[in-house]
A protein has these predicted regions:
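An N-terminal amphipathic alpha-helical segment
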Residues: 1-35
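A sequence-composition feature that detects small, non-aromatic residues
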Residues: 8, 27-30, 40, 63, ...
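A signal for specific C-terminal beta-sheet/loop modules enriched in small/flexible residues
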Residues: 13-25, 49, 74-82
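Short, contiguous, helix-prone interaction/anchoring segments in small proteins
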Residues: 27-61
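Short, compact, well-ordered microdomains
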Residues: 50-82
Length: 82
């Protein structure tokens, strides 16, 4: 029986992580202070939650995970549950 983990793709390099973060926060919506969303699986797989949280704090942004999606509020405004 094959090793289950041998089928998994290799972990991305630090350069790929940096490029993914740069791509995310250079989206027009992010630049204009709006909302962007990404798959939670991609955040975890590509950059990891600690790095993702660090990048959010560094920019003063907030993110919410709902199911398989992460919604990123690209501004420092408070959130109000409706």
């Amino acid at each position: 029986m094959d090793d289950l983990f041998s089928l998994a793709p290799p972990l991305p390099s630090s350069v790929e992580c940096d490029r993914w973060i740069e791509h995310l926060f250079s989206a027009r919506a992010a630049i204009n202070g709006h909302v962007v969303r990404r798959k939670a699986r991609d955040v975890e797989r590509i950059v990891g939650w600690p790095r993702f949280r660090f990048e959010l704090r560094r920019r003063g942004f907030t993110a919410i995970r709902n199911g398989a999606q992460v919604v990123i509020f690209c501004n420092a405004l408070p959130l109000h549950k409706v």
